[in-house]
Structure formats: structure tokens, C-alpha cells
């Protein structure tokens, strides 16, 4: 049975359960005998599916992604890069830690007019309920940075976004204190980062990776929301739940649009296996990270859209922002052990559905090194 047919059958079964119980969602009483063998000690949590983007350069992609979200009742989290809000002519106004003034691994924002449009896209996204989070500035690998380096990077991000460098920043409808999430460029984190984040009032970080069924933990006052380590269905290659890593695993980070449909199907199938394992298992949040790039002919952006359409309207699924997830885990932080163990009445797992314990892929096998990752965002507009 294909994943498409399997999930369609599952959806029909859940709908039948809901109708039988005169409810809009499956009830725990209805499926108590068919679900988990864990003792039910807490209420079944929603299945969070977090869909996020790194980058923010490509203006048409801003509009396309917002339109898709509006049509499909979901919210994105946008991790934005500060240098895309600095005009080319003002690049000396940014001093990257250990790199010096006027240096960026991903280029700059273009003209003042282009930057004004980009600020407006940020404002519109926030006004529509999407979350704006930080991807730092120059897209440098910070894995060796000190606390002082990170402090400088965060301070410059706030100045760029809310005061302006080379242009005057407009009012965005939110302020620096409303930016509470971070993903390190190249996922390059260091001990200095995790000392800096709580001091800057950040609530969560998404720079690490972990098993697909991991429930978030709070470390040093900051929630850990890691990307998942997965096997690509169809090739068995290792990847993170991020489009760039699929791109490297599929075609070594080189364009190969001729195989677009294969890559698209494999990503959909992989994300569906990730979803099914958790949805019918311990309900650990799904973390999916993409970029404003249409690599391999748009295979990965199309796959993300197809996946979102398939799951975001399902019972007990919440395709929200990381801020939504923060609220839930804060309210349930004393239940983290039970959530990780799946100590609630789980939905019956259909025959053929992905296992509740996907293989924990060794991080050393993941395709996409920091060096490969360094320049990928610079080509957002052209991929």
C-alpha cells in the first residue's frame, strides 16, 4: 500500500470514528483498546507540524509562500538573515564576528527599493500570524564563536531589523523582544551561543538535530527544537528534515532537475513516514526546515506543499509556528517524560504505517557539511 493510499485510508477511519462519536475529532475513549500499550497517564497531545524557512532574500518566494499558507490554513516560521536588509552600498555597516566589516557569506540586500519591499514582506507575514525569527546576519559558521561574538551578532541583528543599516527600518508591527527563536547559520552552534540566547530573551533554538520522536527539553532556559535525522524513503540515504540536506543527498548539491519527480516523491514519502511514525506514536513535534530556493527544479518546495496539504487539515494536527509550540511545551513541561514515553491513548496504527520508532540516524552520516552549506543561500534568487 502506498503512503498516499495508506494515509487516505487512515483519514477515512478517523472520520468514521469522529462521526460515530458525534465529535469533530477522534476521542480517546473510542480508540482506547486499539492504541498504545503504554499506560494512559496524560491526555493525548496534538500533533505539531512546524514548517519553517531560512533565508528571506527572494521577494517572489515571500509572496508565494504567504499565498500558499493563506490558502491552506497554516502558519510558517521565517528565520530571516540580517544582511538581506542591508543595501549593497552600505555593507561596511555590518561587522561579522571574526570576519570583519563588509563581509557576508550570502551577499546583501540589493537596492534600497528592494529592501523596502523585503521589510514590507516581513510586516505582511507577521500581520498574517506567521512568526519572524532570527537566522543571524552574515551566514557564517559560528561553531567556534565566543559568547562575545554571539552577543555582537545578535545586537547587530536587532539594529539592522529595527533601526536600519544604510536605510531606515520601517515599523514592522513587532519589536526586537518579539523575536524569540533562532536557527544558527550552517547549524553552527557553540557553547557561547547557548549562554547568549537566554541573556537575549530567546525562548528556543533550532540549531541541533535529534531522533525523529524526540520531545523538546529546556536547557539553560532555552527550548531545544532540533531537526530530525531521517532516512530518505526510496534511497535510504541519511538526511536532516531540511531541503538543503535532501539536495546534497540527492544530487551532491548540484542541479539535477531531470530527476525532479523522483526527488519530490522521495521527500513526500520521507516526510509522510516521519509524520505517521509520530502521529500514531508519541506525537513528538515534526520540524521541517526549507529555504527560499527551488533546488532541483522546485522538487522540494513542491514536496513541502504536497505534504502540508495532506496533513495540515487532519484531526488533532496543528501546523503552527514555533511560538505555538513554545506555548504548549511551557504549559506541559512537567509532563515531558510522559510525552516522550507516549503515555497516553495512542491512535490505532493502520497496517503498513511507519513504525513509531524510526531509526535514529547517526549524525555522522548526514549529507550536507558546514562547508557545503556556507554559500547556498546566496543563490536563492536564481535556483
Where are the predicted features?
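Bacterial N-terminal signal peptides that target proteins for export
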Residues: 1-11
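An active-site-proximal "capping" alpha-helix that borders the catalytic cofactor pocket
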Residues: 150-164
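Active-site beta->alpha N-cap acidic-glycine motif
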Residues: 39-131, 138-141, 160-194, 211, ...
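C-terminal domain-boundary segment and adjacent tail
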Residues: 40-41, 204-216, 269-383
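Bacterial signal peptide processing site
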Residues: 23-25
